[in-house]
Amino acid sequence: MPPKFKRHLNDDDVTGSVKSERRNLLEDDSDEEEDFFLRGPSGPRFGPRNDKIKHVQNQVDEVIDVMQENITKVIERGERLDELQDKSESLSDNATAFSNRSKQLRRQMWWRGCKIKAIMALAAAILLLMIIILIVVKFRT
């Protein structure tokens, strides 16, 4: 046998029900066993709470969407930062290679200049020596 409940309900207990249900269920003389099923969540208590819950759930869903967008943006930003870091490392390596190559080229050009100056000096010395030999041979004879 189910537990016994009060037979007469307050208006607050039945405000969410349809009038015909109330009339049929509460006015008919029923067994005590049937009264067991009359109790349940009432309309006005759940109505505003349900709306508040839906409102809060909508806000939670919006926050979740915003957080997912933010996480996606952070991941994309991280990928872009990785690409930027790779490019900067490549640029740094290229700058170092350019600096080393320019120093090497500068040395090569300096040695080339030294060789040209040495050849010019040797040519001038040979020419001067030939002139001196010609003058000496001319005066001796």
From Swiss-Prot:
All ranges on the Cytoplasmic side of the membrane: 1-118
InterPro entries per UniProt: Synaptobrevin-like, V_SNARE_CC, VAMP4
GO cellular component: cell surface; glutamatergic synapse; Golgi apparatus; phagocytic vesicle; presynaptic endosome membrane; SNARE complex; trans-Golgi network
Transmembrane feature ranges: 119-139
Marked site: (Microbial infection) Cleavage: K87, S88
Gene3D superfamilies associated with the record: 1.20.5.110
Phosphoserine, modified sites: S17, S30
Top-rank taxon, per record: Eukaryota
SUPFAM superfamilies for this protein: SNARE fusion complex
Localization per Swiss-Prot or TrEMBL: Golgi apparatus, trans-Golgi network membrane
Main localisation: Golgi
GO biological process: cellular response to type II interferon; Golgi ribbon formation; Golgi to plasma membrane protein transport; neurotransmitter receptor transport, endosome to postsynaptic membrane; regulation of Golgi to plasma membrane protein transport; regulation of synaptic vesicle endocytosis; SNARE complex assembly; synaptic vesicle to endosome fusion
Domain v-SNARE coiled-coil homology: 52-112
Chain segments carrying region Disordered: 1-51
Family stated for the protein in its record: Belongs to the synaptobrevin family.
Name the record gives this protein: Vesicle-associated membrane protein 4
Native source species: Mus musculus (Mouse)
Gene: Vamp4
